[in-house]
């Protein structure tokens, strides 16, 4: 189905990003324009069920991808580059709660967080990633599901060195509650600035720790 094809394409794009360290679509187009269809790189795919939810698991032929990278002179980064995955749930009270992904923007906050992660990632030489949740039945997942259900999927699907979990909820007219790896209440006035400052501080602390460990 078109949903499966879309999920496979997203998984492929993520794999190219992981191998090249660049999220520029030009590498993907170079590979495809050289006559390589995405499906040629698939070893297998299967639909898995966790807690009665479906998601697609795709396995790629990484050796073949590296071979094509070398042919096209696309640099392959070291496999030892650390990966931090951010699972950020946002409930502004204005609509359904949602998880921050690359493909969706709801609030000004979403863009600021993504821009920071992208910039810091290239600056520090570490992957700061968000889950690509259109691989999951997102709407079903977000309706009355506890965070642990999504975590099962995250651990099954992603390889990462550290998982950072944050839940951002508006708890009154003028207050936000932050839970998980950051625990703090913030006033609505200047909320975005104050939260971003706190988020940067925590993320930098975690990046420093993981880089020390990997030296």
Feature names for model-found ranges:
Residues 1-3:
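Positively charged, aromatic-enriched nucleic acid-contacting surfaces
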Residues 5-31, 86-146, 158, 163:
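N-terminal segment of the mature soluble domain
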Residues 28-89, 98-99:
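Signal peptide-directed extracytoplasmic domains
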Residues 37-48, 85-88, 127-132, 142-181:
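A short, hydrophobic beta-strand-centered structural micro-motif
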Residues 57, 61-64, 154-206:
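Amphipathic beta-strand/beta-sheet edge segments enriched in Tyr/Trp
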Residues 78-85, 89-98, 177-194:
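A short, terminal or domain-edge coil/loop segment
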Residues 133-139, 200-215:
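N-terminal small/polar-rich segments of proteins
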